[in-house]
Each structure stands twice: as structure tokens, then as C-alpha cells.
Amino acid sequence: MCAVVAALWLLLAPPTPDLAAQVYRSNLFGRIGFSVWDLSWYGGHHLPGYSLWFPPLGALLGPRLVGALAAIASVILFERLITPYFSARATRIAAVWFAVIVVCDLLIGRLTYGLGVTVGLCSVLALSRNHPWVADVLGIACAT
């Protein structure tokens, strides 16, 4: 379900409330690289406040594609994380509800948040599979 909605979102490219900021930051990174402060957006703001990872990925792949891939990946990771602990039916229901939430964030353009959720889920999954060092690194990456 999430993959279908993400593909439609990419294809139709609807305007979303938060997408403009992510497109701006990605384009800015593409022009000047990492920057701490920018005066061109509503009188100035600090760029690292949203994400250190999203602008370079957005500049490389495009903000919409990064958001769509993060949405799909987070649903897959969530399902893998809960599968060992719940029945197949409960896992499926939880994954569908999680996908609905992820799709809502995608539709409004909260792309940096979606990428952070994906990295956070990677961290928790690594910890659940007894890879504490990987979980630590991903947890730190999630916080940036």
C-alpha cells in the first residue's frame, strides 16, 4: 500500500505544505554544500536544525524520491521489527496502520521526519538483532 501511494505521489507531484522547505534545502546543498545559516529563507534560519542527511541525499536523488524511498523503507523495517513478537495477523494490522501514518507524513511533505524515522527504525532493528554498535551509530545518525 505504501509503495503504491508513494509511486502515485511521485507521479502526480502534488503541492504539499512542507515540501518547499525540503526542496529549498536540497537545492541549497546542491549549490553550496553544507551551510550553517542561510539568509534567503524568511529572513534567515539555521539549516542543520532539520537534518544533516536529507539535504545531501535530496540534492543527489531529489527530495521527493528520498521521501518516497524513506516511507517505503520505514514500513518494511517496522514490519521486520515487530514480526518476531506478534502473530502474523497482528503484524499485518500494525504494519497497515503504520503505513497509513507514514503515507500521511509523505502527503504533507514531512520528508526529513520520514528519513529520521527510517534511520531510527534501522537502529532499533539492529539492536533487536544483537548489533549494539551498529544500533549506536544509527541512533546517532538518527539524531542528526
Task: Describe each region flagged by the PLM.
Residues 1-7:
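Start-transfer (signal-anchor) and selected internal transmembrane alpha helices
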Residues 7-8, 57, 65, 96, ...:
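Hydrophobic residues within the alpha-helical transmembrane core of Major Facilitator Superfamily
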Residues 8-21:
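Helix-to-loop transition at the C-terminal end of transmembrane segments
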Residues 13, 60-64, 87, 109, ...:
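Transmembrane helix interruption/hinge and helix-loop junction motifs
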Residues 31-65, 142:
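Short hydrophobic/aromatic helix or loop-helix immediately within or flanking a transmembrane segment
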Residues 39-41, 56-92, 97-98:
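Early transmembrane hairpin of solute transport permeases
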Residues 72, 76, 80, 90-130, ...:
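Membrane-embedded helix bundles of polyisoprenyl
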